[in-house]
Amino acid sequence: VVSWKRTQRGIIMEALKLPKKAQKDLNVIFESMVARKIKKERELTAEDFIYQIKRLAHPRATSPIFGHISEYVEGLRELAQRLRKDNDAIVAAHRARYGSADKGLPWLDLRPYELSGATAIDRYTYRIRIKGKYPQFMYWLAMPFFAPIPYEADRFYAQRGMNQGRNITFDWYPVGTGPYMLTENDPNARMVLERNPNFRGEPYPSHGEPEDEARGLLRDAGKMMPFIDRVVFSREKEGIPYWNKFLQGYYDRSGIASDNFDQAVQFSVEGQATLTPEMEAKGIALSTAVATSTFYFPFNFLDPVVGGLSESKRKLRQAISIAVDFEEFISIFANGRGIPAMGPIPPGLFGYREGEAGINPVVYEWVDGKPKRKPIAVARKLLAEAGFPDGRDRKTGQPLVLSLDTVARGPGDSSRLEWYRRQLAKLNIHLEIRATDWNRFQEKIRSGNTQMFFMGWNADYPDPENFMFLLNGPQSRAKTQGENSANYQNPEYDRLFEQMKNLDNGPERQAIIDRMLRIAREDAPWAWGYHPKDYALSHQWVFNSKPNQI
């Protein structure tokens, strides 16, 4: 049985008295704490949650998480097969009558369909049955994929003509029970949230991270939320007007663009970011946090030059990993807002190690209490051992030419691409830039027709599995359309991943992660990249707010 608990990561669940039987067959029971209003007509019930879980299997919804979640929710895959069969019959009949099935398909009511993995116990309680053990499932439940959906709304938006140039769709006019209603929805100009008069109310948190109390973030503990009646999101298309309006107080919060960085932030001798006197005089506050994101530089393992697990290919990738100086990249292109990545896992998540224990020993040394990138001479030695002394093929004498696939976004990218060329030029490697549009770039990655490129990943949920799976062989983008864009495959890494992914956080899981990181660092499927650091500015009248990195 589980209960809801609010943490700094959002709403997650805390297991209570979970029986050992749950190791094989986890029954998760959810209880709606109070009756919640959808409209004045009726309250939220357990069936609304179940209806949405069924929608994950709906062939017209094309849920992006169906493939993954159907491995765990009992009966979801079988439900999808039944729905697909019935939907095919509806489509065939519609096409026979109207000559087309592109628009106006009749509504497919999911209520009559049984789903063994999601059943109602009573009006406000439902059970989800999971195959095996999957601790990360609690994070999925905090995501929109599991938000309750009333069948009435599903039926309403399925009416003929609703989405024919009118944007009368669920995502534009959502139905829910939260503290605010979306009363104005024009993403190109303005979006407005207004207080929901039917909201049940919810107390402000009474506990948080250790520093929250010192920062005054728990001063309103226990008071009923929401505290404000209206939230307005405005889109400013030009950076300078946006920044000036923030300084004048028209906007409450702001990020910091590169052009305004020096006006807002200065660094101490120790490298600590602080506000400039101008910002302090305005009463503006600065908050910083390393994002739960990783930007990385993959090598395509299907490529005959940079891919593969042979010793020579491994040393080639290691040499490039040392040569591409991401400390310099962060300084030049991110105003110092980031930290070099030592592996896939960003700081703040279980599995990430601080200090000397956490460095990538292939790329870094520990010097004077901090990591230091190995000298370029080490990279040149590795390159020679890989069969390319001084950047030339030992057998043919031909210069080594590699390619970087990227999206052509405009002249502003030229300095960044030239920087990549200079990094490989340290090894006398010539880098060709293959710029293309976004769709063609994605097609190249899907088909494995790349050599090197740049990618990023933001956490779906705060668990190391959500980053380590980016190097899991069965997740190969070219082979299975998974998220392993490097198409990296190491049998030992994959075996350890299967052991690690569903373990609870603890010494056993940490030990397995350490072994996986040693393998990945040695194989160097990525040049590792960096974790960005978010900077946010707030005016003095903004309270009870802190960055949420998920």
List the predicted regions and their residue ranges:
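Gly/Pro-rich hinge or "lid" segments in bacterial periplasmic/extracellular proteins
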Residues: 81-125, 129-232, 237-241, 376-377, ...
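A local structural motif
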Residues: 128, 207, 223-234, 396-404, ...
